[in-house]
């Protein structure tokens, strides 16, 4: 079966957990490196979601301006 798409909020929560675990300094260097790698991947996914949302909003705003001008 296909993978269920993770929500923005769930990814952000995972990232916050990773940051907190790295901040407390109680994990090994190896675990820190794994967490860092996972955190970077999550950051990239979150950035993409935000950029996609920004693009959709821009399209909606542009369409709204066109509708207003044609009224």
Swiss-Prot record:
Parts of the chain that traverse the membrane: none
Role played: Bidirectionally degrades single-stranded DNA into large acid-insoluble oligonucleotides, which are then degraded further into small acid-soluble oligonucleotides.
EC id: 3.1.11.6
Repressor among keywords: no
Gene Ontology terms: biological process: DNA catabolic process
Name the UniProt record assigns to this protein: Exodeoxyribonuclease 7 small subunit
Catalytically driven reaction(s): Exonucleolytic cleavage in either 5'- to 3'- or 3'- to 5'-direction to yield nucleoside 5'-phosphates
PANTHER family, per database record: EXODEOXYRIBONUCLEASE 7 SMALL SUBUNIT
Subunit details: Heterooligomer composed of large and small subunits.
Cystine residue pairs: none
Species classification: Bacteria, Bacillati, Bacillota, Clostridia, Eubacteriales
